[in-house]
């Protein structure tokens, strides 16, 4: 690729980044139930539920793996159905019931499956 073409591509990428950073993004208010507890949060229209759970709500038990819904690392239950959180928008959780690995724990401690994950360093599972 010629230097002029490379410079043009770099400028185009810089311009895209600049536009993304200056365009205000409307936030969506969402009310949902997570592991039996009511939650309310703000998210943008493109934010994944995985990102909301981890970055906004601090529920880091749900892991990011492939970001394509194939690996299962981000699996949650949404209204009782197993789904990859990386493929669900945060706004889609409005009025729905979410279950995460944090909700599996028992009052007496870790669920036996959680304990095995811990014992065998199955951190992405």
Regions found by a protein language model. Name each.
Residues 15-125:
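Signature of N-terminal electron-transfer/Fe-S-associated modules in redox systems
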């Amino acid at each position: 690729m010629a230097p002029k073409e490379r410079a043009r591509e770099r400028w185009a990428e810089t311009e895209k980044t600049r536009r993304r950073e200056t365009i205000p993004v409307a936030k969506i208010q969402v009310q949902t139930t997570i592991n039996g507890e009511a939650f309310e949060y703000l998210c943008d229209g493109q934010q994944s539920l995985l990102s909301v759970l981890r970055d906004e709500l601090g529920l880091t038990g749900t892991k990011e793996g492939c970001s394509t819904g194939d690996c299962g690392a981000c699996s949650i239950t949404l209204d009782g159905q197993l789904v990859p959180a990386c493929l669900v928008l945060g706004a889609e959780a409005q009025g729905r019931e979410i279950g995460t690995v944090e909700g599996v724990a028992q009052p007496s401690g870790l669920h036996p499956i959680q304990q095995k994950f811990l014992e065998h360093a199955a951190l992405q599972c």
